[in-house]
């Protein structure tokens, strides 16, 4: 729908806080933009999510809200008036913000209303319900500029972290086994956030003990833009269910995704033709817990390095 007013539609959008959720939100975001066409968007959310979205040409203003910044509801009272407000979060804080801000139309996502399907589809269904449309979910979008610097060597990326909780994490020694075996054919990039340094360091320690030097430990050293650029240059990416996994999906990077407590029906890579999922079919899966409630962590512990290595040929042929 094109705006027939002289001024563009002013929209305020609360984007998902988690990096992976924010990547999965991009098809819904694109559908909003396609519906209004002439639109100016103010977004707010976590610093990681803001960095992912802020370069879109329709975004005119950003407001970062996370643990690093002192939160104040007053900031929203002074944002001015909007034609439409979308919140892609179902939190109590989001409900309060919805009440405070001035907007002609206000919409808030509810997890309970969209219990089934992939998260991409849930976000798109929410937008369809808000706008009375029937738009299909498109591909993931990456709004960051990637200056690919692909060299002659093939690159294997390994991502041992998962910010959601320890239940989603595979084991550093298993990642190390893969890196050691494949180091003759690949340069190694180790990824991770600031809270995952010890896992990356443990992998690095195994590589050093085996006299492997063709690796780069990037854990805690990249912005979201830099992370995206590094991922764009990978030949193979091995990762748990995480934000970087979804960034890789947006770039169609061949990926082996390791799933334990979470549900690949909901959060697998969206429309990545070069993706392989490895998971164990246990009665306790998916528990959706941050830590293993049964204390054995078999959903991840039973995944072996050999089956991941054997999957590389499969994902390479896709």
Predicted segment positions?
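Catalytic machinery of carbohydrate-active enzymes
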Residues: 1-318
């Amino acid at each position: 729908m094109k705006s027939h007013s002289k001024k563009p539609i002013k929209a305020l959008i609360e984007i998902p806080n988690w990096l992976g959720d924010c990547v999965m939100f991009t098809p819904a975001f694109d559908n909003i933009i396609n519906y209004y066409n002439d639109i100016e968007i103010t977004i707010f959310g976590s610093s990681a999510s803001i960095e992912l979205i802020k370069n879109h040409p329709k975004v005119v203003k950003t407001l970062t809200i996370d643990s690093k910044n002192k939160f104040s509801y007053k900031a929203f009272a002074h944002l001015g008036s909007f034609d439409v407000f979308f919140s892609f979060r179902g939190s109590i804080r989001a409900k309060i913000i919805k009440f405070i801000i001035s907007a002609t139309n206000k919409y808030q996502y509810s997890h309970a209303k969209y219990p089934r399907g992939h998260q991409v589809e849930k976000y798109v269904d929410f937008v369809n319900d808000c706008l009375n449309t029937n738009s299909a979910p498109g591909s993931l979008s990456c709004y960051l500029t990637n200056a690919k610097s692909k060299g002659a060597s093939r690159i294997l990326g390994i991502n041992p972290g998962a910010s959601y909780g320890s239940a989603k994490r595979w084991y550093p020694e298993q990642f190390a086994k893969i890196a050691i075996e494949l180091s003759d054919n690949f340069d190694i990039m180790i990824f991770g956030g600031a809270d995952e340094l010890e896992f990356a360091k443990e992998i690095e320690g195994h590589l050093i003990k085996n006299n492997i030097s063709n690796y780069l430990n990037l854990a805690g050293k990249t912005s979201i833009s830099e992370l995206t650029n590094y991922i764009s240059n990978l030949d193979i990416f091995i990762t748990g269910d995480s934000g970087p996994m979804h960034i890789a999906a947006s770039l169609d990077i061949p990926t082996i995704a390791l799933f334990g407590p979470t549900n690949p029906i909901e959060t697998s890579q969206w429309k990545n033709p070069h993706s392989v999922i490895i998971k164990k079919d246990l009665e306790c899966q998916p528990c959706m817990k941050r830590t293993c409630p049964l204390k054995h962590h078999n959903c991840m512990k039973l995944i072996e390095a050999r089956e991941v290595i054997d999957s590389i040929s499969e994902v390479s042929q896709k």
